[in-house]
């Protein structure tokens, strides 16, 4: 059997094992629009809610089958939910409203306000921004913690990285750079130099701001930031003109440094080697599960 076929078989079998735990799908309404979400419930009591936000273009099946953490969380009594939100580089108003409506419904249904937020790539950026939103708005929810995998957090840096990709790379990386530039300029009406306030207010973290921008709302939140900052891999496989400032690990490293200075000693920046660049697989599930159980107790 070829390696690719074997990988696909493992994913299919993993997902079918999750189906045995009854992956359910439902719909909600936000801003007059219907959204979908998918979830797995434990058979017994509900310890809390874990919302996992997928990366751009990632389907819920991939999230639930590719990370064994989801299965282990359900076994420990957590409800695991994967909503379908906009796959933007940041949390727009619609994404925030989707999460608000979803959370409101599930808190009422399960009778628990205990919440863990997690996400990968752009989903991690949305999860981070939503955590900040919950704190800034004093939402009556028990936010236990946040864990994210390689998200783009500082839109000022992301825009600059996009320009570098557009001007100095070829092929799909050049196209990605053009898409980043277009998406952010269309959303905010121009470049960071022209629309600094819009970029700062929509970023999860702004390294150039003394108060960290929205990151100041994370000072009391337990956080795990995961990344595999393999610049050699990036240069070899994507574009040899890319530098450290062009990868998302730059944001995570700077965010942890900022939060530690602010007194958040529960913010961990976890780097790996050989687990896969920009992948859910960066998370070691058993270790992460222990952390979630600890902060939820």
Describe the function of each predicted region.
Residues 1-22:
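Bacterial Sec-dependent N-terminal signal peptides
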Residues 90-110, 129:
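Alpha/beta-hydrolase active-site loop
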Residues 20-45:
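N-terminal cap/lid segment of alpha/beta-hydrolase-fold proteins
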Residues 275, 281-297:
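Catalytic active-site module of serine/aspartate enzymes centered on a nucleophile-bearing elbow/loop
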Residues 46-47, 53-91:
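Short substrate-entry loop that stabilizes the transition state in hydrolases
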Residues 42-49, 218-219:
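Proline/glycine-enriched tight loop/beta-turn segments at coil->beta junctions
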Residues 185-268:
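Serine-hydrolase catalytic core
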Residues 107-109, 113-170:
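Primarily recognizes the serine-hydrolase "nucleophile elbow" in alpha/beta-hydrolase
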């Amino acid at each position: 059997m070829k390696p690719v076929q074997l990988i696909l078989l493992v994913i299919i079998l993993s997902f079918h094992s999750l189906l045995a735990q009854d992956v359910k799908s439902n719909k909600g309404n936000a801003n007059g629009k219907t959204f979908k979400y998918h979830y797995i419930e434990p058979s017994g009591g509900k310890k809390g809610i874990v919302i996992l936000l997928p990366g751009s273009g990632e389907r819920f099946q991939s999230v639930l089958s590719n990370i064994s953490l989801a299965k282990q969380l359900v076994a420990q009594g957590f409800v695991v939910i994967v909503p379908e939100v906009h796959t933007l580089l940041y949390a727009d108003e619609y994404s925030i409203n989707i999460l608000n409506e979803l959370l409101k419904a599930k808190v009422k249904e399960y009778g628990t306000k205990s919440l863990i937020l997690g996400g990968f790539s752009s989903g991690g950026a949305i999860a981070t921004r939503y955590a900040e939103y919950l704190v800034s708005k004093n939402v009556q929810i028990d936010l236990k913690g946040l864990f994210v995998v390689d998200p783009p957090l500082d839109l000022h840096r992301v825009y600059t990285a996009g320009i570098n990709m557009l001007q100095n790379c070829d092929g799909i990386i050049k196209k990605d750079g053009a898409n980043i530039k277009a998406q952010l300029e269309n959303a905010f009406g121009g470049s960071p130099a022209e629309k600094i306030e819009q970029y700062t207010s929509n970023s999860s973290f702004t390294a150039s701001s003394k108060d960290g921008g929205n990151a100041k709302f994370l000072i009391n939140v337990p956080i795990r930031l995961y990344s595999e900052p393999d610049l050699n891999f990036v240069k070899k496989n994507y574009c040899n003109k890319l530098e450290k400032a062009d990868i998302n690990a730059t944001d995570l490293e700077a965010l942890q440094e900022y939060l530690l200075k602010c007194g958040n000693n529960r913010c961990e920046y976890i780097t790996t080697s050989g687990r896969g660049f920009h992948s859910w697989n960066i998370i070691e599930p058993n270790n992460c599960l222990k952390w979630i159980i600890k902060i939820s107790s």
